[in-house]
Structures are given as structure tokens and as C-alpha cells.
């Protein structure tokens, strides 16, 4: 209460910050007449002038006022658009590295040009991040006109570009692209072998559009480049047949936590099924040999109980395609990890794709935290302000609208059942359709959108494709005649190709659009329809310029007429019934776009995004949610008390309860879910930071190695450290020679480097110490390497050293990632032993990293000591190293190795292999027993160095 009084008296911190910007806005406005008087050439020359001032010692902050005035004038001359004062404030917030919350239709795309231009003057590259390729291309082409006018270059990064195209795009002053492409390019760059092959040139400043979607909704989704493992599709199909044979009493499902676990009875039943199928090793399901089987059983159980077709995923073209729970879009190329996707494929009886091994990964949280300065834009960020600050140190600033919002957000209507709710939605749609008010009905999933479509179809409505000109003409004709056409369109992941058309025409009089969350972001819905879309469609075949101009004028008049129809589509509703002689009390509800929500989402932001499609730039509009106690949010998060209360109130079938208290109760439920999800993301980030710190060390090492012309000093240090480790393992410090493990040392030297070094003879010498042994071994190794340099030449050996070092580092890093994944899956069990899983994970991960470093020294030393160069048939320059060309969608690894190999590579009969002479073994399968006779698999013995 005191806080509310203080805010009223002094204003909120947001109000004070906006007020502080006003002085700079006034200064920019004061410059406008002088800047407007400049010629095009003089305006363009200001860019060079600003850069010169920066070089002379001025800061970007010093240049903000004249730079913003310059961009505003360039926008007027190129696009015919002038930045409003509130847009200038938005640009200042972005430049300061914070989040500008701007409502729908307030021109976020134009706002970004201010901060982009100012920061691009530094010459370090500015990245603008969008949610899809369409928006990246659209915004780069559209806003690129401003930058080009001012002498700056614009690039765009979309899927399908080759390396050279990406390099050119990143070399531009301002680069537009999607969050996925930026992240994957970073990972791909850190799998290359030459600096000149890398695409990105640093992480100076990024502006993230729809920042809440990318930095919060997708924060838990890691970007993974992967390669296929062995095919185990039959195993997945076998496991899948067991799940339908379980009863509901055989497992417990927790929908709140999205988890499922077998009961005692379920375990016994699964054990019996596995034993009968010959898939159970040992006596018990939980024997150590069955760890993998238990994992696959759990994933199959999750696939059947927690994941719903047409809600969490769809099946298309023999594939399981994930549906983004926040946007409703198909996530082509994305796959669930840890065998879950394969379990879903087995469940749906489509082709089970092989599991993949992680080659490189990063989360959006860690990728975007690499930028020196990060900023964001969205229409809905205030509800997540705490998370933005805690994780990214970004403050949310609510930018005032240029025109006051005229949308009416009504209280929710709550029904007992979904059937009653759908009947109420149908009645409301019919009322709106009769007065030609366009309606957008928001749903939470594909399944729900199709249920609503079925309700409309059964009531005499017809589904059409808004991309079909003939179907649209029926809608236009009905609007001109003032009659409802009873036509509707569905926008969900199944019809994503029609998205642009559906959104463009959703504001036409009488239009009914049923949409998933796909309609929540991106293109604005304009009242009366989209002028650009209609001109594009209706004048494409007209070649005569005069005829085309006349048609465009007709379209403009048509759309203005439609706009007025929509604006006047007001509704009069009864708010108090008639009593005796007293007439009923009514109230007017505004026209404009009518948003109907068919259920609340877990996040308030998603609901606010849906409401935000209406009421753009001061247009009237209306929004209302229709709910039932059977909705997911109400059902999972405790509708029992509410149901009891409604029963006591004597609520009849078909009646709804409407009260602000209901809205507050729902908001509290949503806040609880948001807080829980925030805690999950925060906890996951703590674990991911452990891997991220190691990733930075490895990637920084790679960059340093790639910068060096020669890594001879590095590999020499690694070789000497390896020898020290080997000697300390077999020779106790200050011990007598009789106490040395000479046989073990000799055997390991032979196994690792293939040299018969007379350490047994040295050990017999009088007075020899461990330090002397170390010096002699280093000398033998160094002389062996010097002989190879003499044989092949220093240039070839320097190339071989660098190639082998980088490739071995990459190989061991991949294996290390797998180890970390496995560790992370089981570390939670340490909590039962009263130990902190996070601290345990940090400690274990550090130990694994130390082991990987030791393996790297050993493997690089072993390979360089054994390396043989295969000369080309004709003398030629050494070719550049091929790079990993990883497709993030397929996970295919097209890496080609350099012209350096270990010889020999031909297959040799097992009987001809000498266990003591590795050079006689030829090519050995990784899963074969090692020919040395150790009893280990080749990949875990000598194969570690192959």
C-alpha cells in the first residue's frame, strides 16, 4: 500500500527513466530542421563524419543525438516514415543495452534502425536477431534502404547459405538473421581449422526482436550439432510394444512436473515382458547391465503418457515433427534428445531415425551472454522482468504508446465443461459475424484449433484458404453487401504455408480466423485487410501501367471502406437485466478486431500477445477469454475448489461465471507456473554454466592454435608433460631403481608410441634417478620427432602437427560432451545421499576435464610419434584443411580429413597380426578386441590413438 502511494507521488522507476530521455528527444527534434535541409550527399557524408569523430576520441553516447536525427531523416527520404518521439526513446533504451517493451503496431522494426546505425559506426558489426527467416529477410530488405542511403552495408543470414555467403553477410555493418542461425554459425566456426574459414567476426552488439520468445521460452532448448550413432531402431520398436500392455495402475503420472514413473507392479510386469523377449540381462531390471534398458523403458513411457499427437508434435511425411509450445509452429529439424524422439517415432509407427552423438552444443542463454552489449524488443516483457535481470542483467523499460490503446479487455467467462465453453464461443462468433466484426479465436494447440473448426463446420460455416483469390473474393463480396459470408480460416502448423495470407486478411469485415499461438507474433493484422497483399495478388497479371494504377486506387478505396465497416462494428450488450418498469441497462462494446481466447496459457505473456493483435496504433478492439474447468491450466493447477464453489452457487448448464476475482485467481495460478518455470531455467543454467566454462576454454584454445603458424612449442610441451605423467605413474618419486615398475613403463611406452626404449637397461645402471630417466626419455622422443622433421620437411610436419592437434582436440571434446551428458542424467541421485548435486557435478565435471586434457596430451604425442605422411602422386601445395559442414537439421558430418594419416590402413587377417607389432595389424574395427591381447576393445586400447 505504501509502495502504491509512493509510486503515485513520485512516479515509478519506469516513469522516471522515460522522463530522463525527454531532454534528448527534445534535442533531436531541435536538430530536425537543419538535418532536413541537407542534400542527400551531405546527409550521407555524416556517416564518415561520425566515424572520424569516434576515431578522434568521442564516444557513441556523444554521437547519439546527431546520429538519431540523421537516421530519422534518412527514414523519411527512403521509406516515407518518420520516427515518433516514443520510437526515439525506444532506440535509446536499445542503445543502452536494455529491453524496450513496445505494444503491437508501435514500429519496433523501425526503432531498431536507430541503435543499429549508431553502434555500427564502431565498425565491429551489429547483429539483429529475429525469430524466423521470413522476418530476417523482410527486415533486412526493408530497413536496409535506410542503411544503404547512409552508406552502410546490410547482410542477412538465413538457412541454406554456404560459408562464403555467410562470411559476406557477417562482414556487413548490420546483419539480420535468426537466433538459430547465429547460434549454429558460432558452433560451426568452432569446428573449423582455419581462421579465414570462420564466418562470425565477434560478438559486439545484438538486438533481439521478440526477446521474450528467444531468451525465455527457448532458453531451455540447446542448439546441438550432432552426428549419427549406431542404428537401434528395432530395439526401440520392441520396447514400444511393451507400453500398451501396461495398466494405468502400473505407473504414476505427474502432469505438473511432466514426469512418469513405474510402480512396483509396473516394474514386475516390465521385467516379465523383457525376460520373455530376451531383452533382460541378469535377474533384475535394475541390475547394472540393464541401465540402458531402463532408460529406454522410461523414455517410451514418457512418449506414451506425457506427449500428445497434434499438441506436442505432429506426424508428417513419415516424420515426428515437434510443435513449439509457445509459438505453435513446426520446429523442422529439431529433435528431442536422449532417445525420446526415437521413442515417439516408435509410438507413431514411423521410421525410427538413428540416435545422434553431440558434436557441439550451446544454449541461447549462454550464446547471447557472450555479446559485449545485448538489447531486446518485444510487446510482452514486463511479466518476466525479474528473470531478464537475474539471468541477462537486462532491465525492461515500458515505452509509452504513440496513441492511447483503445482496446477493451473484458473479464473471462468460466464454464463447467468444454462443451459448454465451445457453445458459448460459437454463439459469440455468430454475434460478431452478423455485424461483420472480424474475429480471431486463439487456441493452445493444433488439436484444439481443429475441435473449434469442427464446431463451426457443424454450424454451417465453411473453411476456406485465404491464399485462394476466389475464396477471398467471396469474403470481399459479402462485406461489400453488408452480409456475413460464414467463412473461416485455420492457422496452425499444418497450414503454415498460408500464414502470410491468413494474417493479412484476418482484419477483413466478417473474417473468422482460428489460430494457434502462431498468430501471436510477427505481421500486424490491419483493419480492412492488407493493402500490400491485395496489390500483390490482384495486379500481378496486369501489364498496362494505367490499368494497374486504376486497380490500385480501387483496392485502396475498397480497404478504406472495409476499415470503416470494421470500426463501426460495435456491439451493444446487456449489463443489467430489466426490473419491473426499469429497462435493461446496456453498454457499447467497441468494433475493431475481436480477440477470443479459448483457454488460458501457462504464461501470461502468451495471453497478452494474443490480446495484443487487436488495438494497434490506437485502433479500437476487444478481447475476451472463454474458459472451462476442464482446460489444462484449470485442471492441472487445482480447479477442484472452484468447481465446488460453482456448484454451491447453483450454476446451471450453459451458464458462466464472470467476475474479476476469477481473473485474479487465474493470474495467481499463472504466476505460480511462471515462477516454477523460472526456477527450472535458473537451475538448468547453473548446470549448463559448468559445461559453458569448459566450452569457452576449449574454443579459446582452438582459436589460439589456429592463429599460430606453428604449434611445435605446444606439442613439445604436451609431449614432455605426457612423459612426466608416465614416469610418475610407474616410478615413485625418489625411489630406488629396484622399486620402479620397469616392465609396466616399457610396455606402456611400446603401446603408446611404438618404440622399444631400453628403460630396463637404464634401470640397471648404478645411481640412476627418476630425473635422469625423464631427461633420457625426453631426448629419445625429441630425437624421434626431429628425424620425422628431417624426413618430411618442417612445413609438412608443422601442418601435420596442427592438423592432428585440432582433430584430436575435437574428437576428445565430443567424447567429453557425452560423458558430461551421462553425468548430468545421474547426478541428481546424489541428493539422496545429502550431497548437493550441483557441487557434485562441478567437481566430477572438473575431474573429467582434467582426464580429457591428459588423454589429449597422450593421444597427440602417440599420433605424432607414429605418423607417416602419404605423399601425393604429383608434387603440389598442401591443400587447406576441409572443415566440418554440419547440417543442424540432419546432424550429418561431412568432415574430410587432411592429407595426413596413420599407416598402414589395409585390412590384415587376424592370424597374421603380431600382438607386439601394431604396424602389422592393418585396419582394425573399433569394436573388435584389440590385437595386443589386452582383452579390451580396440577403441578403448590402441584404437584411442588411431
From Swiss-Prot:
Its EC number is 7.4.2.8. InterPro entries: Helicase_ATP-bd (IPR014001), P-loop_NTPase (IPR027417), SEC_C_motif (IPR004027), SecA (IPR000185), SecA_CS (IPR020937), SecA_DEAD (IPR011115), SecA_motor_DEAD (IPR014018), SecA_preprotein_X-link_dom (IPR011130). It is a peripheral membrane protein. Its cofactor is Zn(2+). Residues 936-946 have a biased composition (Basic residues). Its main location: membrane. One of its GO terms (cellular component) is plasma membrane. Keywords: ATP-binding, Cell inner membrane, Cell membrane, Cytoplasm, Membrane, Metal-binding, Nucleotide-binding, Protein transport, Translocase, Translocation, Transport, Zinc. May bind 1 zinc ion per subunit. GO terms for biological process: intracellular protein transmembrane transport; protein import; protein targeting; protein transport by the Sec complex. Residues 872-892, 904-946 are annotated as: Disordered. The keyword Membrane applies. ATP binds at residues 87, 105-109, 524. One of its GO terms (molecular function) is ATP binding. Part of the Sec protein translocase complex. Interacts with the SecYEG preprotein conducting channel. Has a central role in coupling the hydrolysis of ATP to the transfer of proteins into and across the cell membrane, serving both as a receptor for the preprotein-SecB complex and as an ATP-driven molecular motor driving the stepwise translocation of polypeptide chains across the membrane. Belongs to the SecA family. Monomer and homodimer. Part of the essential Sec protein translocation apparatus which comprises SecA, SecYEG and auxiliary proteins SecDF-YajC and YidC. This is Protein translocase subunit SecA. It comes from Rhodopseudomonas palustris (strain BisB5).
